[in-house]
Amino acid sequence: MNESKSTLKGKVKRYAKVSSKLTTVSAKIASNKLVGKGDNNKNAELVLNALGGLKGPLMKVAQLLSTVPDLLPKEYSEKLQQLQADAPSMGSFFVKRRMKSELGLNWQKKFKNFDIKAKKAASLGQVHKAKVNNISLASKLQYPDMMSTVDADLKQLKIIFSLYGTWDKTIKTKDIYTELSQRLKEELDYKRELKNMLLYGNILKNEKFINIPKPIKKLSTNRLLTMTWLEGTSLMSWKESNQEIRNHIAKTLFNAWYIPFYKYGIIHGDPHPGNYQVTNEFKKLPSLNLLDFGCIRIFPSSFVGGVIDLYKAIRDNNEELAIKAYKAWGFKNLTKEIINILHIWAT
């Protein structure tokens, strides 16, 4: 079977799987409500299982929705938060087949140990713990046929965006779709992510409370990324810490985000909690592990200047400077009403 036929087959299978899962979930929820069993906990569990099994962009959307305060009912938000770091993983058969595809028939001989059971599963791939020369490693293995999955999901999202555009014409969904499409396809290129990891390691090398894994090139391919293992706990597990610790973690998160942006125009485009860990390797103050570098956006200096101008404009209530900032971002035909709306989003 040639590549185009294989890709088409993958897309058709994806359309069928998405339609089947979402239709089944919708029917069950509707049935529960009809017979007076509108239990949000059970319904949220149905949605979690459906989206977790789908992987790909639709799962990423669910991850994003779970991070927006008050957007979803509490039961749904809590369930979908599990997708940030604990999604369903591939079975051992698929793992072995995928590893053989990436590193060859004798792939296991390249490792001292390789745990077939995933330590973490996400939307586009899953992470396995391994060891080489007594060094602990993390191998991120992409799920099978993800390009077809992404293409199929993007087509469905495009339809949703088009429908939304007929209802609300103030938001240009075409630009959102283009940006989303480009970033998602970049995330499938693990060699690109390897370069991003090296870039962030260099940018943040002087930040003693920020840890960046080191990639292992000889054990990495376009769809397999191997790096040094970083040990830590989830970001949310530290929310009950004392104020000094929480302030320190917040400041470290700020530095991890804004030092690359303000100095180099580089932004981490997928900052959901599952992409961070906190570790207490320092006795008094913990440090932050950055784990994912697939979605990195580089902006021109004019855009960064616009961000700084807007911060000053809002701080000083300077509308003229705010208009200059919005124009630097590409906004045109700015009216008082549009500026007020932009201010709401900016603050």
Write out the residue ranges for each language-model feature.
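Helix-rich C-lobe and terminal helical cap/extension of kinase-like folds
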Residues: 4-8, 12, 35-42, 221, ...
